[in-house]
Amino acid sequence: MPTVSGSENKTIAGFMFNWVKDNCNLPTDFTYNFNFTSTGSSISFVPEKSIGIYEWDVCGNYEAEFPFSIIIGVSATDDASRMKPYIIFDTIVEKLDEVTAKIWDYNSGFSINIDSTKTVLKIEQISTPVVIRQGEDNSIDVQSLFKLYYEKEVH
């Protein structure tokens, strides 16, 4: 699968980080990180690999996919705190499903523009959340994979 330029990768990654942070009703008492995880209550956005182009048209327009992870870290001192990442992921997925439904309802006129040439087609969760780290201090990191699909129009 062909990939896009490094600058387009940066644009898309930065857009998605800020969009998820600003639009998914996430907790305000968490630290937000781009491309790294930290200790304590944190939500990290990690691009998984380069954006892949999966469809071209005769004019040079294309559709591409951007895989990314969200990693939620908490101090898990009891069952309720161990469940917090999963509840946050549910909130994120509900918002993504709602937005994707609006995008695909052509009568709504709703769209998310990344910039003047790129428009979001769909954002979806592609894996269930899993614990990827458990610290000796009872902290845990829970990760889920997502994918943004977008189209770029060549002007």
Cite the ranges covered by each PLM segment.
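Charged, amphipathic alpha-helical segments and their flanking helix caps
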Residues: 1-35, 51-155
